[in-house]
Amino acid sequence: MSITISLKSQNVERDVVIPVEWKDITVKYWGELSTIIKKHYSSATQEDEKKNNQTHELLESPLMEDLIKDNPLNDSQILKMNADIFSYITGLTKEETSLVDVSQITQVISLINKLTEEYKPKGMSSFEFEGQKYYFPSEFFRKSTYGDFIESTQLDMYIKDMENGRFDVLPEQMAILCRRLDEEYDEEAIPDKSEKFRGLTMDVIWEFSFFLTQQTERLVKLSPTYLVKQLQVQEL
């Protein structure tokens, strides 16, 4: 659930809704928030200006945890980053943010930090979006060979992106694989559907990511190459 806090700035109070769970935020929101955080850590390593100014660069390699571990920010840099995060979350301008009490900024940042906790999958197999129910492609996986799946979904590319933390690629993958019961595959509809799915909340994105990983591991174990390697290991 989201919570509402009251901010005071120049004797003016404003209620602001703060997301505290993955289901409270969309892929687009998380991408923009991630970009702000990465920008500050990247600037600490003096990366080139062009890369720092990219938008919606969602946790691209190097991973966020690597940036944080290898490039700790000093107190001044942390304050600047927190101010930018606060401004984005609350919708206040930087000028308005500078007038907000530090304790309130700290309160908001501490709430957002809950989103860094590891997501625990619930085993979702479908989701509702804009009044429609979409299903994860369980039947597709049951009927497909690993080779067919690789070819039809460009899985190798998506797995590489997912390993680098780039969950912004998943709306397109979901647009291809997740369908309503009465929906047929339509390649021409994928771009619009992908853009629409950028409005999905991150809990659904996480669930699909886990689903995709589990199904992929299962198909890998059924592939001829994997079985041959297993036999070779047993013969050693």
Annotate each PLM feature.
Residues M1-L236:
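Charged interaction scaffolds used for protein-protein
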